[in-house]
Amino acid sequence: MNINDIRGLSDTEIKKKLEDAHKELFELRLKLSTRQLVNHRELPRVKNDIARILTVMRERELQIR
């Protein structure tokens, strides 16, 4: 997910995306622990998405952009 795409979303949509990303990360970690995860690059991708979402939320909180 691109940061400009996230910036175009409303606050409620961003919160929903964050919730979905946390759920996806949980499921990926569960698959990793049971050795069912095929693509290991999914974990860092989801973590980066969460970081981008939190960055945009913080920008809005501080009214930077």
Swiss-Prot record:
One of its GO terms (molecular function) is structural constituent of ribosome. Keywords: Ribonucleoprotein, Ribosomal protein. GO terms for biological process: translation. InterPro entries: Ribosomal_protein_uL29, Ribosomal_uL29, Ribosomal_uL29_sf. The keyword Aminoacyl-tRNA synthetase does not apply. The keyword Ribosomal protein applies. It comes from the Bacteria. SUPFAM superfamilies: Ribosomal protein L29 (L29p) (SSF46561). One of its GO terms (cellular component) is cytosolic large ribosomal subunit. It holds the Pfam family Ribosomal_L29. PANTHER family: 60S RIBOSOMAL PROTEIN L35/50S RIBOSOMAL PROTEIN L29, LARGE RIBOSOMAL SUBUNIT PROTEIN UL29C. Belongs to the universal ribosomal protein uL29 family. This is Large ribosomal subunit protein uL29. The gene is rpmC.
